[in-house]
Amino acid sequence: MRAPWFPCLVLATLLSHAVLAGVRTLISYRALALGGDAVTVGLVTGAFALLPLVVALHIGRAVDRGGGVLVVRLGLILTVAAVLVAAASPSAGFLIGASAVLGLGQILHTVACQSLIPLWSPPEKVDDRFGQLTLGVSAGQLVGFPVAGSVATLTNAGATTGEQVATTPALLVMAGLAALAVPLAFWFVPAERIRVSRADASAVRQSTLAILGTRGMKPAVYSSLTVLTGMDLLMAYLPLLGQSMGLGVGAVTMLLTARSVASVVSRAAMPLLLRAVPRRVLLVSATLASGAPMALVPLTTDIVLLTVMMLVVGFFWGLGQPLTMSWVTTVADPHNRAAALSVRLAGNRIGQVVVPLAAGGLAGITGAGAIFHAGGLLLLSSALCTLVSTREPPAEPGRVAPSRHGVHPTDVTSRRTRRRPAGR
């Protein structure tokens, strides 16, 4: 018996992001255990984004032609492989390779899931479904951090202060969790199966510059970039900062979990917030209200105050990602929605390559604390850009702008191969 497509996508997303959250923190500890330093952590973190940056737009084109389901499956399989390589990595070089493959698997899965929502959903449900998908992301992080942290804490019970953290058992547990997501991608019933010929796709294809030239696209990409980069810096460098501040694995895990809990709450409350608060206010606050706490993290060792900061940051970050997804799909040409989402993710990856590498160099000179100051400033600059660019409110997700070619993608049927939805 086949299952409905949307619950399967959300559950697969929950599992894959549980793995992603746990593994990326564990990889930082493993890099240190293999003799690395802040620069090594920066290289490992940057590798996660480098390969996806190269292939992001090609993935979007494949999804726009109807290959979304295959892309989801490939992404989940690569995630399992990457975690197994990380668990067995004998050197920083292998760890960098595992991080790159993990990033590729994640962007395959992410682009496909985000693109299938506007393709297979009624317009009035797009906002809610993006919110539910990102709620799955936050719930996954909420699961991933404590699972990885608990296994690592048990594995390292009795270790002396300053001793390197053993990560192999926790990474193997994460690999098992990743494997649970793979069957879900083969189980659901696609809402529809559409194949678009290369000739049809080429006729309506926009270049990257044309996509970025769409009104509202650049600030949406920048807002998403700063939020996701902030998440990356927090996951990658809080362990390093924690070691220098005397915080153990359990304390760091608790802080990251608090951030995830707050994101779950904000995403669960998003339908109510959208009815009560103007969309522009939510978009601006996503980066404005999170910038100051991010910058202040290195200035205290008080665990209660740090937890409050994580709760504030997590709540507002939880709003930013689904709102920018809806913004991008609304302003994008209908034929190029997956490509536009890929451009958004490519922008995220540019930030994930450049910022961690710069942060690693900065940390090597000034210490890990400066990374959090820089991340906070990026968030505040994004808030200013969003405020200026949304003087006219972003369009509602149900109000899709007409295609520059004058036709909606579902109207181009002459050279498409359509099959009836499976199970009907």
Q: Could you tell me what each predicted segment is?
A:
Residues V55-G67, S266-P278:
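Helix-to-loop junctions at the C-terminal end of transmembrane segments
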Residues R2-A49, K218-P219, S223, V227-L241, ...:
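Helix-loop boundary and gating motifs at the non-cytosolic
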Residues A100-V137:
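Cytoplasmic helix-loop-helix junction between adjacent transmembrane helices
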Residues L20, V101-C113, V312-T324:
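Core transmembrane helices of Major Facilitator Superfamily
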Residues A175-V196, C385-T390:
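C-terminal membrane-cytosol helix-exit motif in multi-pass small-molecule transporters
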Residues L70-L84, V281-A295:
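Structural signature of the two symmetry-related core transmembrane helices
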Residues M1-A3, F188-V221, S403-R418:
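Juxtamembrane intracellular "pre-TM" segments in multi-pass secondary transporters
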Residues G35, G67, A88-P90, T300-T301:
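Helix-breaking motifs and short loop linkers at transmembrane-helix boundaries and internal kinks
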